[in-house]
Protein backbone atom coordinates (compact mmCIF):
# COMPACT_ATOMS: atom_id res chain seq x y z
CA UNK A 1 0.00 0.00 0.00
CA UNK A 2 1.29 3.45 -0.94
CA UNK A 3 2.28 5.41 2.16
CA UNK A 4 2.72 9.04 1.19
CA UNK A 5 1.18 10.67 4.25
CA UNK A 6 3.84 13.15 5.31
CA UNK A 7 1.69 15.04 7.82
CA UNK A 8 3.51 13.38 10.71
CA UNK A 9 6.73 15.10 9.67
CA UNK A 10 7.81 18.66 10.40
CA UNK A 11 6.77 21.30 7.84
CA UNK A 12 8.75 20.98 4.62
CA UNK A 13 10.98 24.06 4.41
CA UNK A 14 12.26 24.72 0.90
CA UNK A 15 14.22 27.73 -0.34
CA UNK A 16 15.82 28.92 -3.54
CA UNK A 17 18.84 31.11 -4.07
CA UNK A 18 17.80 34.74 -3.83
CA UNK A 19 18.36 36.42 -7.16
CA UNK A 20 20.85 39.23 -7.57
CA UNK A 21 19.07 42.41 -8.64
CA UNK A 22 21.71 43.83 -10.96
CA UNK A 23 19.95 42.42 -14.06
CA UNK A 24 16.55 41.01 -15.14
CA UNK A 25 15.71 37.30 -14.79
CA UNK A 26 16.84 34.72 -17.37
CA UNK A 27 15.83 31.11 -18.05
CA UNK A 28 18.17 29.77 -15.34
CA UNK A 29 16.35 31.80 -12.70
CA UNK A 30 13.03 30.48 -14.01
CA UNK A 31 14.16 26.85 -13.92
CA UNK A 32 15.28 27.05 -10.29
CA UNK A 33 12.10 28.67 -9.06
CA UNK A 34 9.84 26.34 -11.01
CA UNK A 35 11.81 23.34 -9.70
CA UNK A 36 11.30 24.50 -6.11
CA UNK A 37 7.64 25.30 -6.77
CA UNK A 38 7.08 21.82 -8.23
CA UNK A 39 8.59 20.20 -5.14
CA UNK A 40 6.58 22.45 -2.80
CA UNK A 41 3.36 21.54 -4.63
CA UNK A 42 4.30 17.85 -4.59
CA UNK A 43 4.89 17.91 -0.83
CA UNK A 44 1.55 19.66 -0.26
CA UNK A 45 -0.09 17.03 -2.47
CA UNK A 46 1.14 14.46 0.03
CA UNK A 47 -0.39 16.15 3.05
CA UNK A 48 2.69 17.94 4.28
CA UNK A 49 2.70 21.51 5.51
CA UNK A 50 5.13 23.56 3.41
CA UNK A 51 7.02 26.83 3.79
CA UNK A 52 8.50 27.90 0.45
CA UNK A 53 10.87 30.89 0.56
CA UNK A 54 12.33 32.75 -2.39
CA UNK A 55 13.36 36.35 -2.98
CA UNK A 56 16.01 38.81 -4.07
CA UNK A 57 19.55 39.77 -3.06
CA UNK A 58 19.59 43.57 -3.21
CA UNK A 59 22.91 44.70 -1.74
CA UNK A 60 26.48 44.70 -3.03
CA UNK A 61 28.96 46.42 -5.28
CA UNK A 62 27.46 45.21 -8.57
CA UNK A 63 24.11 46.72 -7.64
CA UNK A 64 25.74 49.99 -6.59
CA UNK A 65 27.65 50.19 -9.89
CA UNK A 66 24.58 49.29 -11.97
CA UNK A 67 22.56 51.98 -10.18
CA UNK A 68 25.29 54.57 -10.79
CA UNK A 69 25.35 53.62 -14.46
CA UNK A 70 21.56 53.97 -14.66
CA UNK A 71 21.69 57.33 -12.87
CA UNK A 72 19.38 56.30 -10.02
CA UNK A 73 19.76 55.43 -6.34
CA UNK A 74 20.55 51.81 -5.43
CA UNK A 75 17.15 51.44 -3.75
CA UNK A 76 15.30 52.76 -6.79
CA UNK A 77 17.32 50.48 -9.04
CA UNK A 78 16.72 47.29 -7.03
CA UNK A 79 13.02 48.06 -6.63
CA UNK A 80 12.68 48.20 -10.41
CA UNK A 81 14.54 44.93 -11.01
CA UNK A 82 12.76 43.22 -8.10
CA UNK A 83 9.41 43.93 -9.73
CA UNK A 84 10.55 42.02 -12.84
CA UNK A 85 11.24 38.94 -10.74
CA UNK A 86 7.96 39.21 -8.80
CA UNK A 87 5.96 39.57 -12.02
CA UNK A 88 7.70 36.60 -13.66
CA UNK A 89 7.00 34.29 -10.71
CA UNK A 90 3.32 35.27 -10.81
CA UNK A 91 3.25 34.57 -14.54
CA UNK A 92 4.86 31.13 -14.15
CA UNK A 93 2.64 30.11 -11.24
CA UNK A 94 5.45 30.07 -8.68
CA UNK A 95 3.50 30.24 -5.40
CA UNK A 96 5.84 31.02 -2.51
CA UNK A 97 4.92 31.39 1.16
CA UNK A 98 7.70 33.79 2.14
CA UNK A 99 9.46 36.57 0.25
CA UNK A 100 13.05 37.45 1.14
CA UNK A 101 14.21 40.96 0.29
CA UNK A 102 17.57 41.83 1.81
CA UNK A 103 16.71 45.53 2.15
CA UNK A 104 13.96 44.53 4.59
CA UNK A 105 14.57 45.91 8.08
CA UNK A 106 13.64 42.53 9.59
CA UNK A 107 16.50 40.93 7.70
CA UNK A 108 18.90 43.72 8.61
CA UNK A 109 18.17 43.25 12.32
CA UNK A 110 18.93 39.51 12.17
CA UNK A 111 22.13 40.01 10.16
CA UNK A 112 23.41 42.58 12.63
CA UNK A 113 22.44 40.40 15.60
CA UNK A 114 24.36 37.47 14.09
CA UNK A 115 27.40 39.62 13.42
CA UNK A 116 27.34 40.88 16.98
CA UNK A 117 27.04 37.34 18.37
CA UNK A 118 29.96 36.13 16.24
CA UNK A 119 31.97 39.15 17.36
CA UNK A 120 31.15 38.38 21.00
CA UNK A 121 32.24 34.76 20.43
CA UNK A 122 35.63 36.04 19.21
CA UNK A 123 34.90 34.68 15.73
CA UNK A 124 35.60 38.01 14.00
CA UNK A 125 38.80 40.05 13.85
CA UNK A 126 40.20 42.98 11.87
CA UNK A 127 43.35 43.00 9.76
CA UNK A 128 44.93 44.65 6.73
CA UNK A 129 45.10 42.80 3.43
CA UNK A 130 46.86 43.47 0.15
CA UNK A 131 45.97 41.40 -2.89
CA UNK A 132 43.65 40.84 -5.81
CA UNK A 133 39.91 41.45 -5.80
CA UNK A 134 37.21 40.31 -8.26
CA UNK A 135 34.74 43.12 -8.88
CA UNK A 136 32.25 40.75 -10.55
CA UNK A 137 32.23 38.16 -7.76
CA UNK A 138 32.83 40.73 -5.01
CA UNK A 139 35.49 38.64 -3.31
CA UNK A 140 39.23 38.60 -2.67
CA UNK A 141 41.22 36.10 -4.71
CA UNK A 142 44.16 33.88 -3.83
CA UNK A 143 46.63 31.87 -5.87
CA UNK A 144 44.11 28.99 -5.80
CA UNK A 145 41.95 30.96 -8.22
CA UNK A 146 44.74 31.41 -10.77
CA UNK A 147 44.86 29.28 -13.90
CA UNK A 148 47.85 27.27 -15.12
CA UNK A 149 49.26 30.36 -16.83
CA UNK A 150 49.05 32.38 -13.60
CA UNK A 151 46.12 34.53 -14.72
CA UNK A 152 42.64 34.78 -13.25
CA UNK A 153 39.91 33.24 -15.42
CA UNK A 154 37.11 35.04 -17.25
CA UNK A 155 34.61 34.01 -14.57
CA UNK A 156 36.20 36.56 -12.20
CA UNK A 157 35.61 39.51 -14.55
CA UNK A 158 37.58 42.64 -13.73
CA UNK A 159 40.34 41.87 -11.19
CA UNK A 160 42.01 44.76 -9.37
CA UNK A 161 44.74 45.07 -6.74
CA UNK A 162 43.55 46.32 -3.37
CA UNK A 163 45.12 47.13 -0.04
CA UNK A 164 42.68 47.80 2.77
CA UNK A 165 41.67 46.95 6.31
CA UNK A 166 38.65 44.68 6.83
CA UNK A 167 36.88 42.39 9.26
CA UNK A 168 37.41 38.65 8.93
CA UNK A 169 35.47 35.57 10.04
CA UNK A 170 37.54 32.67 11.44
CA UNK A 171 36.40 30.27 8.76
CA UNK A 172 39.61 28.23 8.92
CA UNK A 173 38.89 27.18 12.52
CA UNK A 174 35.90 25.15 11.33
CA UNK A 175 37.29 23.53 8.17
CA UNK A 176 38.07 20.18 9.79
CA UNK A 177 34.61 20.07 11.36
CA UNK A 178 33.06 20.67 7.92
CA UNK A 179 35.25 18.02 6.30
CA UNK A 180 34.11 15.46 8.86
CA UNK A 181 30.49 16.56 8.62
CA UNK A 182 30.38 16.15 4.84
CA UNK A 183 31.97 12.70 4.99
CA UNK A 184 29.58 11.51 7.71
CA UNK A 185 26.45 13.07 6.18
CA UNK A 186 26.16 11.91 2.55
CA UNK A 187 22.66 13.40 2.29
CA UNK A 188 23.97 16.93 2.93
CA UNK A 189 24.48 17.55 -0.79
CA UNK A 190 22.37 16.23 -3.68
CA UNK A 191 23.51 14.89 -6.06
CA UNK A 192 26.14 13.22 -3.89
CA UNK A 193 28.96 13.51 -6.44
CA UNK A 194 29.01 17.27 -5.80
CA UNK A 195 30.45 16.60 -2.33
CA UNK A 196 33.84 15.87 -3.88
CA UNK A 197 33.94 19.41 -5.31
CA UNK A 198 33.47 20.75 -1.80
CA UNK A 199 36.02 18.47 -0.14
CA UNK A 200 38.62 19.42 -2.73
CA UNK A 201 37.96 23.11 -2.06
CA UNK A 202 38.59 22.75 1.69
CA UNK A 203 42.33 22.27 1.36
CA UNK A 204 44.17 25.39 2.43
CA UNK A 205 40.97 27.08 3.56
CA UNK A 206 41.45 30.68 4.65
CA UNK A 207 39.44 33.07 6.77
CA UNK A 208 36.59 34.97 5.13
CA UNK A 209 36.56 38.73 4.70
CA UNK A 210 33.03 39.72 5.82
CA UNK A 211 33.19 43.50 5.39
CA UNK A 212 33.78 46.24 2.85
CA UNK A 213 34.83 49.81 3.75
CA UNK A 214 32.00 52.31 3.35
CA UNK A 215 34.31 54.58 1.39
CA UNK A 216 34.30 51.92 -1.35
CA UNK A 217 30.85 50.41 -0.86
CA UNK A 218 28.03 52.21 0.90
CA UNK A 219 25.13 50.00 -0.29
CA UNK A 220 25.04 47.32 2.40
CA UNK A 221 24.24 46.52 6.03
CA UNK A 222 26.56 48.34 8.48
CA UNK A 223 28.52 46.23 10.97
CA UNK A 224 26.95 46.80 14.41
CA UNK A 225 30.35 47.05 16.12
CA UNK A 226 32.14 49.15 13.47
CA UNK A 227 29.94 51.39 11.34
CA UNK A 228 32.82 52.33 9.04
CA UNK A 229 32.16 49.03 7.28
CA UNK A 230 29.22 47.29 5.61
CA UNK A 231 28.67 43.53 5.56
CA UNK A 232 29.99 41.40 2.68
CA UNK A 233 27.08 40.70 0.34
CA UNK A 234 27.37 36.89 0.50
CA UNK A 235 27.24 36.83 4.30
CA UNK A 236 24.21 39.11 4.20
CA UNK A 237 22.50 37.04 1.48
CA UNK A 238 22.99 33.62 3.10
CA UNK A 239 21.38 34.78 6.33
CA UNK A 240 18.06 35.19 4.48
CA UNK A 241 17.41 31.46 4.88
CA UNK A 242 17.02 31.92 8.62
CA UNK A 243 16.10 35.60 8.98
CA UNK A 244 12.87 35.14 6.99
CA UNK A 245 12.23 31.81 8.72
CA UNK A 246 11.92 33.51 12.11
CA UNK A 247 15.43 33.09 13.54
CA UNK A 248 16.00 35.45 16.51
CA UNK A 249 12.59 37.00 15.80
CA UNK A 250 11.68 37.57 19.44
CA UNK A 251 15.16 38.81 20.33
CA UNK A 252 15.32 41.46 17.59
CA UNK A 253 11.61 42.38 17.62
CA UNK A 254 10.54 40.88 14.28
CA UNK A 255 6.79 40.28 14.30
CA UNK A 256 4.56 37.96 12.22
CA UNK A 257 7.37 35.57 11.39
CA UNK A 258 7.31 31.76 10.96
CA UNK A 259 8.03 29.55 13.97
CA UNK A 260 11.73 28.91 13.40
CA UNK A 261 11.94 25.94 15.76
CA UNK A 262 9.04 24.34 13.91
CA UNK A 263 10.36 24.61 10.34
CA UNK A 264 14.17 24.50 10.68
CA UNK A 265 16.34 22.86 9.39
CA UNK A 266 15.66 23.53 5.73
CA UNK A 267 14.75 20.35 3.88
CA UNK A 268 16.03 21.83 0.64
CA UNK A 269 18.19 24.80 -0.30
CA UNK A 270 17.71 24.69 -4.09
CA UNK A 271 20.76 26.33 -5.70
CA UNK A 272 22.81 26.33 -8.89
CA UNK A 273 26.13 24.49 -9.10
CA UNK A 274 27.96 27.81 -9.54
CA UNK A 275 27.15 28.92 -5.99
CA UNK A 276 27.78 25.62 -4.23
CA UNK A 277 31.47 26.35 -3.60
CA UNK A 278 32.33 28.27 -1.58
CA UNK A 279 29.14 30.09 -0.57
CA UNK A 280 26.57 27.41 0.25
CA UNK A 281 28.72 24.39 1.02
CA UNK A 282 31.52 26.13 2.94
CA UNK A 283 30.55 29.59 4.18
CA UNK A 284 26.96 28.76 5.11
CA UNK A 285 27.36 25.57 7.18
CA UNK A 286 30.37 27.07 8.94
CA UNK A 287 28.43 30.25 9.74
CA UNK A 288 25.69 28.10 11.28
CA UNK A 289 28.21 25.92 13.12
CA UNK A 290 29.93 28.99 14.57
CA UNK A 291 26.52 30.23 15.75
CA UNK A 292 26.02 27.00 17.69
CA UNK A 293 23.82 25.01 15.28
CA UNK A 294 24.29 21.26 15.76
CA UNK A 295 25.04 18.77 12.99
CA UNK A 296 21.38 17.70 13.06
CA UNK A 297 20.37 21.31 12.41
CA UNK A 298 22.25 21.67 9.13
CA UNK A 299 20.19 22.23 5.97
CA UNK A 300 20.25 20.03 2.85
CA UNK A 301 21.61 21.38 -0.44
CA UNK A 302 19.87 20.47 -3.72
CA UNK A 303 22.26 21.47 -6.49
CA UNK A 304 21.02 21.86 -10.06
CA UNK A 305 22.97 22.26 -13.28
CA UNK A 306 23.01 24.94 -15.97
CA UNK A 307 20.90 25.45 -19.05
CA UNK A 308 23.17 25.83 -22.06
CA UNK A 309 22.16 27.04 -25.52
CA UNK A 310 23.44 24.85 -28.34
CA UNK A 311 26.02 23.43 -25.96
CA UNK A 312 27.32 26.85 -24.93
CA UNK A 313 26.83 28.52 -21.54
CA UNK A 314 24.51 31.52 -21.67
CA UNK A 315 26.25 34.90 -21.45
CA UNK A 316 25.51 38.52 -22.27
CA UNK A 317 28.72 38.65 -24.30
CA UNK A 318 27.54 35.89 -26.64
CA UNK A 319 24.05 37.35 -26.78
CA UNK A 320 22.42 33.98 -26.10
CA UNK A 321 20.64 34.77 -22.83
CA UNK A 322 17.07 33.46 -23.01
CA UNK A 323 14.23 35.58 -21.60
CA UNK A 324 11.67 33.30 -19.87
CA UNK A 325 8.93 35.91 -20.32
CA UNK A 326 9.21 35.62 -24.09
CA UNK A 327 9.29 31.83 -23.99
CA UNK A 328 6.22 31.65 -21.74
CA UNK A 329 4.37 33.93 -24.14
CA UNK A 330 5.03 31.41 -26.93
CA UNK A 331 4.54 28.02 -25.25
CA UNK A 332 2.36 29.20 -22.31
CA UNK A 333 3.60 29.26 -18.70
CA UNK A 334 2.61 25.62 -18.16
CA UNK A 335 4.28 24.66 -21.42
CA UNK A 336 7.51 26.22 -20.20
CA UNK A 337 7.21 24.58 -16.76
CA UNK A 338 6.67 21.20 -18.39
CA UNK A 339 9.63 21.53 -20.73
CA UNK A 340 12.02 22.72 -18.00
CA UNK A 341 11.07 19.82 -15.72
CA UNK A 342 10.95 17.23 -18.50
CA UNK A 343 14.25 18.02 -20.19
CA UNK A 344 16.64 18.44 -17.26
CA UNK A 345 17.78 15.81 -14.79
CA UNK A 346 18.13 17.50 -11.41
CA UNK A 347 21.82 18.10 -10.75
CA UNK A 348 23.02 17.92 -14.35
CA UNK A 349 23.32 20.37 -17.24
CA UNK A 350 20.86 20.43 -20.13
CA UNK A 351 20.71 22.07 -23.54
CA UNK A 352 17.88 24.49 -24.29
CA UNK A 353 16.43 23.53 -27.65
CA UNK A 354 13.64 25.26 -29.55
CA UNK A 355 12.96 22.05 -31.44
CA UNK A 356 12.71 19.89 -28.31
CA UNK A 357 10.54 22.50 -26.62
CA UNK A 358 8.10 22.52 -29.52
CA UNK A 359 8.06 18.72 -29.60
CA UNK A 360 7.31 18.68 -25.87
CA UNK A 361 4.48 21.14 -26.41
CA UNK A 362 2.93 19.95 -29.68
CA UNK A 363 3.53 16.20 -29.49
CA UNK A 364 3.19 15.61 -25.76
CA UNK A 365 1.05 18.36 -24.23
CA UNK A 366 -1.16 19.12 -27.24
CA UNK A 367 -1.05 15.81 -29.11
CA UNK A 368 -0.77 13.45 -26.14
CA UNK A 369 -2.59 14.93 -23.16
CA UNK A 370 -4.75 17.63 -24.78
CA UNK A 371 -5.94 15.42 -27.61
CA UNK A 372 -6.78 12.59 -25.22
CA UNK A 373 -8.91 14.90 -23.08
CA UNK A 374 -10.63 16.33 -26.14
CA UNK A 375 -11.39 12.90 -27.60
CA UNK A 376 -12.64 11.47 -24.31
CA UNK A 377 -14.99 14.38 -23.62
CA UNK A 378 -16.17 14.76 -27.21
CA UNK A 379 -17.13 11.09 -27.45
CA UNK A 380 -18.82 11.14 -24.05
CA UNK A 381 -20.85 14.20 -25.05
CA UNK A 382 -21.71 12.81 -28.48
CA UNK A 383 -22.70 9.32 -27.39
CA UNK A 384 -23.92 9.82 -23.81
CA UNK A 385 -24.53 13.60 -23.42
CA UNK A 386 -21.56 13.62 -21.03
CA UNK A 387 -23.12 11.24 -18.50
CA UNK A 388 -20.85 8.47 -17.20
CA UNK A 389 -21.90 4.99 -16.21
CA UNK A 390 -19.52 3.56 -13.63
CA UNK A 391 -21.36 0.25 -13.35
CA UNK A 392 -22.00 -0.74 -16.94
CA UNK A 393 -21.65 -4.43 -16.14
CA UNK A 394 -18.99 -4.86 -18.82
CA UNK A 395 -15.33 -5.65 -18.21
CA UNK A 396 -12.51 -7.29 -20.13
CA UNK A 397 -8.72 -7.63 -20.19
CA UNK A 398 -8.34 -4.35 -22.09
CA UNK A 399 -10.12 -2.45 -19.31
CA UNK A 400 -8.23 -4.32 -16.63
CA UNK A 401 -4.89 -3.49 -18.25
CA UNK A 402 -5.64 0.25 -18.21
CA UNK A 403 -6.80 0.07 -14.60
CA UNK A 404 -3.55 -1.70 -13.69
CA UNK A 405 -1.49 1.09 -15.28
CA UNK A 406 -3.49 3.73 -13.42
CA UNK A 407 -3.15 1.83 -10.13
CA UNK A 408 0.62 1.42 -10.49
CA UNK A 409 1.35 5.05 -11.29
CA UNK A 410 1.00 6.78 -7.86
CA UNK A 411 3.62 4.71 -6.01
CA UNK A 412 6.17 4.94 -8.82
CA UNK A 413 5.44 8.65 -9.26
CA UNK A 414 5.85 9.32 -5.54
CA UNK A 415 9.17 7.48 -5.40
CA UNK A 416 10.64 9.44 -8.33
CA UNK A 417 9.34 12.85 -7.31
CA UNK A 418 10.38 12.46 -3.69
CA UNK A 419 13.91 11.65 -4.89
CA UNK A 420 14.06 14.86 -6.98
CA UNK A 421 13.84 12.87 -10.22
CA UNK A 422 11.12 15.12 -11.60
CA UNK A 423 11.53 14.03 -15.21
CA UNK A 424 11.01 10.41 -14.19
CA UNK A 425 7.99 11.38 -12.09
CA UNK A 426 6.48 12.98 -15.20
CA UNK A 427 7.23 9.79 -17.15
CA UNK A 428 5.33 7.69 -14.61
CA UNK A 429 2.24 9.90 -14.98
CA UNK A 430 2.66 9.86 -18.75
CA UNK A 431 2.37 6.07 -18.81
CA UNK A 432 -1.34 6.56 -18.11
CA UNK A 433 -1.69 9.03 -21.00
CA UNK A 434 0.13 6.74 -23.42
CA UNK A 435 -1.90 3.72 -22.36
CA UNK A 436 -5.19 5.64 -22.50
CA UNK A 437 -4.47 6.82 -26.05
CA UNK A 438 -3.73 3.21 -27.05
CA UNK A 439 -6.92 2.20 -25.25
CA UNK A 440 -8.94 4.47 -27.56
CA UNK A 441 -7.29 2.94 -30.63
CA UNK A 442 -7.93 -0.62 -29.42
CA UNK A 443 -11.53 -0.15 -28.29
CA UNK A 444 -12.58 2.16 -31.17
CA UNK A 445 -15.54 3.82 -29.38
CA UNK A 446 -16.84 5.31 -32.63
CA UNK A 447 -17.44 1.74 -33.87
CA UNK A 448 -19.00 0.62 -30.59
CA UNK A 449 -21.45 3.52 -30.81
CA UNK A 450 -22.86 2.12 -34.05
CA UNK A 451 -23.83 -1.20 -32.43
CA UNK A 452 -26.54 -1.11 -29.75
CA UNK A 453 -25.38 -4.52 -28.54
CA UNK A 454 -22.06 -2.87 -27.55
CA UNK A 455 -23.72 -0.18 -25.38
CA UNK A 456 -22.39 -1.55 -22.08
CA UNK A 457 -18.88 -1.83 -23.48
CA UNK A 458 -19.05 1.75 -24.80
CA UNK A 459 -20.15 2.93 -21.35
CA UNK A 460 -17.17 1.19 -19.76
CA UNK A 461 -14.73 2.65 -22.31
CA UNK A 462 -15.97 6.22 -21.80
CA UNK A 463 -15.79 5.83 -18.02
CA UNK A 464 -12.28 4.37 -18.10
CA UNK A 465 -11.01 7.28 -20.21
CA UNK A 466 -12.50 9.98 -17.99
CA UNK A 467 -11.38 8.24 -14.79
CA UNK A 468 -7.81 7.84 -16.08
CA UNK A 469 -7.72 11.55 -16.96
CA UNK A 470 -8.89 12.48 -13.45
CA UNK A 471 -5.89 10.59 -12.04
CA UNK A 472 -3.55 12.34 -14.49
CA UNK A 473 -4.93 15.73 -13.42
CA UNK A 474 -3.74 15.00 -9.89
CA UNK A 475 -0.31 13.57 -10.70
CA UNK A 476 0.65 16.35 -13.11
CA UNK A 477 -0.74 19.17 -10.95
CA UNK A 478 2.67 20.11 -9.45
CA UNK A 479 4.13 20.37 -12.97
CA UNK A 480 1.37 22.05 -15.00
CA UNK A 481 -0.97 23.40 -12.29
CA UNK A 482 -3.07 25.74 -14.43
CA UNK A 483 -3.71 23.10 -17.09
CA UNK A 484 -4.69 20.55 -14.44
CA UNK A 485 -7.24 22.95 -12.96
CA UNK A 486 -8.70 23.36 -16.46
CA UNK A 487 -8.70 19.58 -16.95
CA UNK A 488 -10.65 19.01 -13.76
CA UNK A 489 -13.11 21.75 -14.71
CA UNK A 490 -13.77 20.04 -18.05
CA UNK A 491 -14.06 16.68 -16.30
CA UNK A 492 -16.51 18.25 -13.86
CA UNK A 493 -14.44 17.03 -10.91
CA UNK A 494 -12.72 19.01 -8.19
CA UNK A 495 -10.08 17.60 -5.87
CA UNK A 496 -11.46 17.55 -2.31
CA UNK A 497 -9.60 19.67 0.24
CA UNK A 498 -6.62 17.77 1.61
CA UNK A 499 -6.64 15.28 -1.26
CA UNK A 500 -3.37 13.34 -1.47
CA UNK A 501 -1.59 11.05 -3.90
CA UNK A 502 -2.44 8.18 -1.56
CA UNK A 503 -6.15 8.94 -2.11
CA UNK A 504 -5.86 8.03 -5.80
CA UNK A 505 -8.11 4.98 -6.06
CA UNK A 506 -10.22 3.85 -9.00
CA UNK A 507 -13.66 5.42 -8.72
CA UNK A 508 -12.95 9.15 -8.37
CA UNK A 509 -15.86 9.78 -10.74
CA UNK A 510 -19.20 8.45 -9.49
CA UNK A 511 -21.91 6.67 -11.43
CA UNK A 512 -23.96 9.26 -13.28
CA UNK A 513 -21.14 11.82 -13.19
CA UNK A 514 -21.65 14.69 -15.62
CA UNK A 515 -18.68 15.67 -17.76
CA UNK A 516 -18.17 19.17 -19.11
CA UNK A 517 -17.61 20.37 -22.65
CA UNK A 518 -14.16 19.96 -24.24
CA UNK A 519 -12.00 23.04 -24.69
CA UNK A 520 -8.50 22.76 -26.23
CA UNK A 521 -6.07 22.45 -23.32
CA UNK A 522 -2.91 23.15 -25.32
CA UNK A 523 -3.70 24.55 -28.80
CA UNK A 524 -1.06 23.44 -31.30
CA UNK A 525 1.69 25.95 -32.14
CA UNK A 526 3.74 26.63 -35.23
CA UNK A 527 7.49 26.16 -34.81
CA UNK A 528 8.91 29.33 -33.29
CA UNK A 529 12.22 30.45 -31.88
CA UNK A 530 12.36 31.00 -28.14
CA UNK A 531 15.74 32.70 -27.97
CA UNK A 532 15.64 36.32 -26.82
CA UNK A 533 18.77 38.12 -27.86
Model segments located where?
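Basic, alpha-helical terminal appendages of large translation-related enzymes
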Residues: 2-11, 25, 51, 55, ...
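Structured secondary-structure scaffolds
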Residues: 2, 7-47, 51-54, 106-110, ...
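Generic structural marker for isolated residues within well-ordered, non-membrane alpha-helices
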Residues: 63, 82-85, 284, 324, ...
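Conserved, charged catalytic cores of large soluble enzymes
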Residues: 2, 7-21, 38-210, 247, ...
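Generic structural concept
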Residues: 366, 370, 403, 407, ...
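Short, mixed-charge aromatic SLiMs
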Residues: 139-143, 268, 307-312, 363, ...
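Short, charged/polar, low-complexity loop and linker segments
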Residues: 349-354, 407-415
Amino acid sequence: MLNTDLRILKPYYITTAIDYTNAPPHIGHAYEKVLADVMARFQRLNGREVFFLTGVDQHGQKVQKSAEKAGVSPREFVDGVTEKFVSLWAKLGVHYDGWAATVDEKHKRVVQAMLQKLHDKDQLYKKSYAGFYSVRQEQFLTDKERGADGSFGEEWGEVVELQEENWYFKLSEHIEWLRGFIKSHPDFIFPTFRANDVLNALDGGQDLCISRPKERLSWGIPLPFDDRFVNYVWFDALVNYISFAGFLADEVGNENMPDFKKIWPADAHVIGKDILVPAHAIYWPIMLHAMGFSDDEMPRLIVHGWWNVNGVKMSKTLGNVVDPNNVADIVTPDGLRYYLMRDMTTGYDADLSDERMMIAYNKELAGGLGNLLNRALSMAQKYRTGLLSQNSGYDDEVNQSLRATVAAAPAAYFEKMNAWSIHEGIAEAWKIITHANQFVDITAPFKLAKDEAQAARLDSVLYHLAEALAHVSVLLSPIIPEACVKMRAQLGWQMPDGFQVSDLKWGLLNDGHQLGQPVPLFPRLELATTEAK
